A protein has these predicted regions:
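Short alpha-helical segments and helix-capping/turn motifs at coil-helix boundaries
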Residues: 6-14, 79-84, 107, 252, ...
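An acidic- and aromatic-residue-enriched active-site/binding cleft used to recognize and process polar
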Residues: 9, 29, 73-76, 99-101, ...
């Protein structure tokens, strides 16, 4: 059997691995939920985000004529279960997007080799740079600097660059203008309220409370986009209601308002419902039409093409080194209070 394999953070529109000639398996990979080899007590709302968004994505693909199957996390709890899945389905060929996860890639490579499965690797739309572009920039460097990387990205992508090849407004970064205190009389837009009538919301909560009892947090205040429509709505509402003042109060904090003028788009971007290219293009287009201040536009763009891509690069070339070292020789666990 030839299959398209999709992971919980690869719910892209469009998805490069999709083909109606292949069965689509959406894998509730344990690395994202409850892995036995690398046990992690993820927050219950992260678990909920994955389970609900996978179900929505599967339903939509089925409506579009794809043959989609969800492989429940209970079927793959240990690394050897990968092999059982591929064997039981007589998989001979796999099309998959770069998981950008060392453990997942290692497990896939192992089973591909052992079972002699032909694999087709696709760069992920979840980042702007390809895997090769990241390697070309980071591999031969001994030190890494965000500022240098960010300026290179701006030039390469021709974002906020004038006809002379210089930064629009005269500065590469307006970070110094992103630090205003929140005035007492400032009007904060109300948070988006997502609804979940079309998903199995109640049963998902019961499933999480039953199977993830020891995980941190609760599902009570869950309010994240779980499908493409909700994610696009979140992007549009940020641009219309918060973008204007995002820059000035980017670093502000409030005991009353959780998000202030922030977009809260990271969850949707990190599971593929929005792509960084899409968010950057939308913000640039909106700014052209609505005269968004440069400190808001540049500050927002910097988070995506600067910080997000930069940290992805560090993970790709130094992730294993960082994960397996303990420079400060710490021995104590992180307190539970950090997750409350």
């Amino acid at each position: 059997m030839k299959i398209s394999l999709i992971l919980p953070h690869q719910l892209f529109y469009p998805n490069p691995v999709l083909s109606r000639s292949r069965t689509v398996f959406i894998l509730e990979d344990p690395i994202f939920l409850n892995d036995k080899e690398y046990p992690t007590r993820f927050h219950k709302q992260k678990i909920m985000l994955h389970l609900l968004s996978i179900k929505c994505y599967s339903d939509e693909l089925n409506e579009y004529g794809y043959n989609v199957k969800i492989l429940d996390s209970s079927a793959i709890k240990a690394p050897n279960d990968y092999e059982s899945f591929f064997k039981s389905n007589k998989v001979s060929e796999v099309h998959y997007v770069d998981p950008h996860d060392f453990i997942v890639q290692k497990r896939l490579n192992k089973v591909f080799k052992k079972l002699r499965i032909k694999s087709h690797f696709y760069d992920t739309p979840g980042f702007i740079n390809t895997k090769d572009e990241i390697d070309d920039y980071f591999l031969n460097k001994k030190k890494f600097f965000l500022t240098t990387f960010y300026q290179k990205e701006r030039k390469k992508l021709n974002i906020l660059i004038n006809h002379e090849g210089k930064p629009v407004g005269g500065k590469w970064s307006y970070d110094s203008e992103n630090r205003k205190k929140l005035p007492k009389n400032v009007k904060i837009p109300p948070p988006i309220k997502n609804t979940y009538e079309n998903v199995d919301f109640k049963n998902t909560i019961e499933h999480i409370n039953s199977n993830f009892k020891q995980n941190y947090g609760t599902t009570d205040s869950f309010n994240y986009p779980v499908n493409r429509s909700q994610a696009k709505n979140a992007l549009n509402l940020f641009l219309e209601k918060r973008f204007l003042d995002f820059g000035s109060y980017e670093d502000a904090i409030s005991t009353e308002h959780r998000f202030i003028f922030h977009s809260v788009l990271s969850p949707a971007m990190n599971i593929g419902l929005l792509t960084p290219n899409e968010v950057v293009s939308a913000s640039l287009d909106f700014s052209d039409q609505h005269s968004i201040p440069i400190n808001s536009l540049e500050g927002f763009i910097r988070q995506i093409i600067g910080w997000r891509e930069f940290i992805r690069g560090i993970y790709q070339v130094k992730g294993v080194y960082q994960r397996t070292k303990n420079h400060w020789n710490f021995t104590k666990k992180i307190p539970d209070e950090f997750y409350s």
